[in-house]
């Protein structure tokens, strides 16, 4: 699709991944039966150990797309600059900016029934079952028709985005005769931020659902407005730290 988005999109969530020299953020729109549209993808370059880059991220998350603002955000705290990520989430809990940590393995739900409490920052930490989300995402990527579970991408996304989105595969190994499956990079050193941030945005949606949000009802209510969303072009933002 191009720059207009059908009014079936009712809810926006975001996933945030922190790297050593940048923050990447993906905003996903959700409609009936979890039909999804990638709304925006940003690479914010700078130093995550200081406040300026986080201010850039806050500016993105405070934006609006058409009538919609981001309803929930999942920020990965399991990698770089954990302390800064916790502090960012701690001061924005009222906006549903949640600290998360991905965990692989069978049987883990997409979103936990209750958070744990972090030692750093004393804030709720939500353990996300990333394998369950990746299973769902890769199954949905095979769908070729609009409808429940389908994922739509704007034409402006480049090839690197799709390489990252499809950078992993399921590997099955046997331990004491039992098959154990896990998601692994297809190649060593393969970047996968597009996949991770989509997974986190999906997890944020389930965080909202766990709080009682009814996605299909939201989609019906918003669809009645008969409006399309005019989307902004993707940007690569260079933090003021780099100037």
Where are these regions (language model features)?
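Mg2+-dependent endonuclease catalytic cores in nucleic-acid-processing enzymes, primarily RNase H-like
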Residues: 1-6, 14, 25, 33-178, ...
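Short acidic, Gly/Ser-rich segments with clustered Asp/Glu that frequently serve as metal-coordination loops
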Residues: 18-22
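Extracellular low-complexity, Gly/Ser/Thr-rich intrinsically disordered linkers
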Residues: 166-213
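Hydrophobic, well-ordered secondary-structure elements that form the walls
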Residues: 17, 73, 197
């Amino acid at each position: 699709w191009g720059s207009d988005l059908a009014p079936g999109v009712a809810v926006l969530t975001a996933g945030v991944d922190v790297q050593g020299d940048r923050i990447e953020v993906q905003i996903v729109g959700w409609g009936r039966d979890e039909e999804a549209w990638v709304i925006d993808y940003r690479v914010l370059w700078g130093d995550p150990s200081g406040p300026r880059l986080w201010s850039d991220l806050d500016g993105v998350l405070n934006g609006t797309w058409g009538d919609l603002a981001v309803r929930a955000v999942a920020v990965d705290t399991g990698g770089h600059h954990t302390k800064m990520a916790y502090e960012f989430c701690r001061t924005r809990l009222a906006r549903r900016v949640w600290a998360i940590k991905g965990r692989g393995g069978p049987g883990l739900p997409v979103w936990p029934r209750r958070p744990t409490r972090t030692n750093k920052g004393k804030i709720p930490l939500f353990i996300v079952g990333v394998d369950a989300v990746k299973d769902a995402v890769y199954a949905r990527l095979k769908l070729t028709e609009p409808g429940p579970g389908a994922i739509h991408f704007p034409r402006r996304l480049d090839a690197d985005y799709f390489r990252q989105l499809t950078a992993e595969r399921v590997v099955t190994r046997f331990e004491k005769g039992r098959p154990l499956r896990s998601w692994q990079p297809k190649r060593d050193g393969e970047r996968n931020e597009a996949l991770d941030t989509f997974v986190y945005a999906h997890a944020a949606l389930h965080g909202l659902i766990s709080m009682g949000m009814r996605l299909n009802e939201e989609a019906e209510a918003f669809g009645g407005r008969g409006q399309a969303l005019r989307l902004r072009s993707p940007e690569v933002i260079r933090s003021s730290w780099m100037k």
